[in-house]
């Protein structure tokens, strides 16, 4: 067959040589001396071709060079056996590629040759890089006899066997190899232990980190939930509220342009206090800014402990509606009026709650400017809630900076300035005055009169339509407000001192017949502390009632945290962190000890049926509380079968009336027989007033100012009225709305208690469940006020007329046998300030 190219010749030669090797084995190699070189050349060509096939994606130029070198080697190695060709054909380029070997299926042969080359290298080079003795011993001429000594019949067989053979090494290398292997295993073991330890530490750190991050994650989840809820609310806003969503019940408060109702949400059945502001009155009184400010501040203070929450607002064509928290126990003032004064423990607790409320407000740059007992509400747990932010002020950053550097103005002391102040107070408009601030009801049942120095009633009588130019209430306003000074949080600290004084003493510290007198006392800081006033409380009040705002206790403290006030001895023992979670001390009828006298508390339990209701009895009581007069409905008369010394027939009544006409007190009895009379000291807190007390056949208990000869009021009669004597001088008279503290200087307290109880049984019967006269020691303290009511004043107590003639002896005391004159003496219509 004629060959057309060198490549075909080489291919054919290689194929023949491979077939010869397979058939003849070693003998073929021995017969052909040049076969070794030819085999090597062929193997080289095949190896290069295989490498080219495997790395065909690499640089083509380098592979082409390798192929050319292999071709040259193969040509030089086979010159002895290959026939000579023409020179022009011999100079042709020889090209060996993968396609040539693919055609004759020599890929398997390339793999075998590569394995043989690897075996040769492993057997002749040890692990340390030195040439082994096997290579030196087998350096024969042909280099093929070493395969025979190893038991292989051909290089191919040796190549196949090399896949399972180990590396040929020297003994020294094997020893080094074993040491290295052992060291490697030890390193692996140590690294595994270190990894296990690190893994445990990582797990522990991860768990602790998870525990630390858990609260933060919960907060983040809550924030995300709140944000999602807000987004949902924004996307799906709640339907607008209207008056039709609430059932309006009784009204619980009234202002100059608003009325507060108790209402029930028809959807949730929750009770709310809804303040209804009439738009017409707001425009007439120019209260637009007050309404906006109140809404803004209430939104800011909502969900803050100690403040009334604003649930929602809405409006219609006539009114604006503020839906607020309903304070079930009402405001604090009726409690002070009811029990006369708080004990020290009760005062300490509520003063601490007010201090916390001031800290919350001032931390948010809010100054209330009208703190007073009427604006301090009590929830169902008897904790305080601050309300009525119509006079509040939100301080800007600039105003707050000025407040810290505030210098008080010079006090106005000369008479010219006083005259100017008087003119200003009489002529300027009023921003604070409303019906709520007009009425300070101390619980006395008077004929539109006030027994003691009640400033608010005197304001109303002095100038009912007078206007003033400041924001606040007269008894609690600070000097800097009267002097038109900058408004600072110290104004609320002044009011706090006034409230602490009133809780202990029973009356505000500044009192007078009109606003001007009160303002003069405030500017002079004329505070009188009666006997029995707690010393620590007195020190606290003195440090709070300073004319210069900078000198007040707490004024130099950081905004929102009054550390100096908290550290005052009066607040010793207060746990500020859990104050609002504690149960407040019960409010007992309390008579502070004066001089050497002991403190007295009552043991009689007042009926707790003062909650608002819809029956006729409750409506009558609410109506009397709203109008400030007693009920005109006569209580049913229950006849007692037992003989009573006060049960007089008509003839006896006429005889007694004729005898008492010459008595100067007859004119105050309104045609009724005076059964018992005597001078008593009527106590309210730490203040006492001398009064003439009359017990008549009404039954009525009338007390009169013996100096001015003015009827001051009456103690309202009811089946629930009880008398309780504490000793020979002091006795209490309990009514559903108030406890009256009376002191008989002549020592007839027991006689008074028996007389009052006999008259009650005569008028209303003698139920077996009630005792005749109550007596308890001064240490008893079981009487607690458990529900709220307005202290109802009554000038016309229900009178029960007796018609059946029953013989009865006259009163036992000498003062009861005095005759009365036949003519009625007129009384002065005016009322002057009682002496302190």
From Swiss-Prot:
Binding positions (ATP): 256-258, 275, 325-327, 331, 374, 388
Class of enzymatic activity (EC top level): transferase
GO molecular function annotation: 3-phosphoinositide-dependent protein kinase activity; ATP binding; protein kinase activator activity; protein serine kinase activity; protein serine/threonine kinase activity
GO cellular component: cytoplasm; cytoplasmic side of plasma membrane; cytosol; neuromuscular junction; nucleus; plasma membrane
GO biological process: apoptotic process; cell differentiation; cell surface receptor signaling pathway; insulin receptor signaling pathway; intracellular signal transduction; negative regulation of apoptotic process; negative regulation of TORC1 signaling; phosphatidylinositol 3-kinase/protein kinase B signal transduction
Region feature (PIF-pocket): 277-322
Knockout consequences: Death during the second instar stage.
This protein's domain notes: The PIF-pocket is a small lobe in the catalytic domain required by the enzyme for the binding to the hydrophobic motif of its substrates. It is an allosteric regulatory site that can accommodate small compounds acting as allosteric inhibitors.
Protein name: 3-phosphoinositide-dependent protein kinase 1
């Amino acid at each position: 067959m004629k060959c057309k190219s060198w490549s075909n010749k080489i291919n054919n030669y290689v194929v023949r040589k491979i077939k010869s090797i397979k058939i003849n084995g070693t003998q073929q190699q021995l017969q052909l001396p040049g076969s070794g070189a030819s085999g090597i050349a062929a193997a080289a060509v095949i190896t290069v071709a295989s490498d080219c096939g495997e790395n065909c994606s690499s640089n083509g130029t380098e592979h082409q060079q390798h192929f050319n070198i292999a071709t040259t080697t193969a040509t030089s190695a086979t010159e002895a056996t290959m026939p000579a060709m023409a020179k022009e054909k011999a100079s042709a380029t020889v090209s060996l590629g993968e396609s040539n070997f693919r055609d004759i299926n020599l890929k398997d042969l390339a793999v075998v040759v590569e394995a043989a080359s690897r075996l040769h290298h492993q057997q002749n080079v040890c692990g340390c890089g030195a040439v082994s003795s096997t290579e030196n011993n087998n350096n024969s001429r042909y280099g093929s006899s070493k395969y025979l000594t190893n038991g292989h019949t051909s290089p191919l067989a040796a190549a196949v066997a090399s896949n399972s053979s180990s590396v040929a090494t020297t003994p020294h290398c094997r020893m080094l190899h074993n040491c290295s292997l052992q060291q490697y295993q030890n390193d692996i073991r140590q690294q595994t232990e270190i990894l296990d330890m690190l893994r445990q530490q990582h797990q522990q750190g991860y768990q602790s980190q998870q525990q630390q991050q858990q609260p933060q994650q919960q907060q983040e989840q809550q924030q995300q939930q709140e944000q999602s809820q807000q987004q949902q609310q924004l996307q799906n806003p709640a339907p607008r509220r209207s008056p039709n969503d609430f059932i309006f019940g009784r009204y619980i408060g009234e202002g100059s342009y608003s009325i507060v109702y108790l209402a029930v949400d028809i959807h949730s059945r929750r009770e709310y206090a809804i303040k209804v502001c009439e738009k017409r009155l707001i425009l007439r009184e120019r209260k637009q800014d007050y309404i906006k400010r109140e809404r803004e501040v209430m939104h800011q203070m909502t969900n803050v402990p100690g403040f009334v929450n604003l649930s929602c607002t809405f409006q219609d064509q006539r009114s604006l509606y503020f839906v607020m928290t309903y304070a079930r126990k009402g405001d604090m003032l009726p409690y002070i009026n009811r029990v006369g004064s708080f004990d020290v423990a009760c005062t300490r607790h509520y003063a601490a709650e007010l201090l916390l409320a001031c800290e919350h407000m001032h931390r948010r740059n809010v100054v209330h400017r009208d703190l007073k007992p009427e604006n301090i509400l009590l929830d169902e747990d008897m904790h305080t809630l601050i309300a009525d932010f119509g006079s509040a002020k939100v301080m800007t950053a600039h105003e707050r900076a000025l407040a810290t550097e505030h210098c008080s103005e010079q006090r106005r002391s000369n008479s010219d300035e006083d005259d100017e102040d008087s003119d200003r107070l009489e002529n300027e408009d009023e921003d604070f005055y409303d019906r709520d601030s007009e009425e300070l009801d101390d619980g006395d049942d008077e004929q539109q009169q006030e027994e003691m120095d009640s400033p608010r009633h005197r304001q109303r009588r002095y100038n009912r339509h007078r206007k003033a130019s400041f924001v606040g209430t007269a008894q609690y306003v600070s000097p800097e407000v009267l002097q038109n000074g900058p408004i600072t949080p110290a104004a609320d600290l002044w009011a706090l001192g006034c409230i602490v004084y009133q809780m202990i003493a029973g009356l505000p510290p500044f009192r007078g017949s009109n606003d001007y007198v009160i303002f003069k006392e405030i500017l002079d800081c004329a505070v009188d502390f009666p006997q029995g006033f707690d010393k620590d409380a007195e020190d606290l009040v003195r440090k709070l009632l300073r004319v210069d705002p900078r000198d007040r206790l707490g004024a130099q403290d950081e905004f929102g945290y009054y550390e100096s006030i908290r550290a005052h001895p009066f607040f010793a023992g207060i746990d500020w962190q859990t104050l609002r979670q504690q149960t407040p001390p019960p409010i007992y009828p309390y008579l502070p000890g004066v001089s050497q006298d002991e403190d007295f508390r009552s043991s009689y339990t007042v009926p707790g049926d003062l909650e608002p209701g819809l029956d006729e009895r409750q409506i009558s009581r609410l109506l009397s509380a709203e109008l400030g007069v007693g009920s005109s409905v006569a209580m049913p008369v229950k006849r007692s079968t037992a003989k009573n010394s006060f049960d007089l027939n008509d003839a006896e009544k006429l005889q007694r009336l004729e005898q008492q006409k010459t008595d100067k007190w007859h004119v105050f009895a309104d045609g009724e027989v005076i059964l018992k009379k005597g001078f008593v000291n009527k106590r309210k807190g730490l203040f006492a007033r001398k009064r003439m007390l009359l017990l008549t056949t009404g039954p009525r208990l009338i007390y009169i100012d013996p100096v001015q000869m003015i009827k001051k009021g009456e103690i309202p009669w009811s089946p629930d009225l009880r008398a309780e004597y504490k000793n020979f001088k002091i006795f209490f008279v309990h009514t559903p709305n108030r406890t009256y503290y009376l002191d008989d200087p002549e020592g007839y307290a027991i006689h008074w208690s028996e007389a009052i109880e006999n008259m009650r049984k005569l008028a209303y019967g003698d139920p077996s469940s009630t005792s005749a006269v109550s007596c308890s020691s001064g240490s008893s303290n079981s009487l607690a006020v458990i529900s709220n009511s307005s202290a109802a004043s009554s000038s016309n107590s229900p009178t029960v007329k007796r018609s059946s003639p029953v013989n009865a002896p006259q009163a036992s005391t000498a003062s009861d046998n005095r005759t009365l004159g036949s003519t009625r003496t007129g009384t002065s219509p005016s009322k002057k300030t009682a002496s302190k």
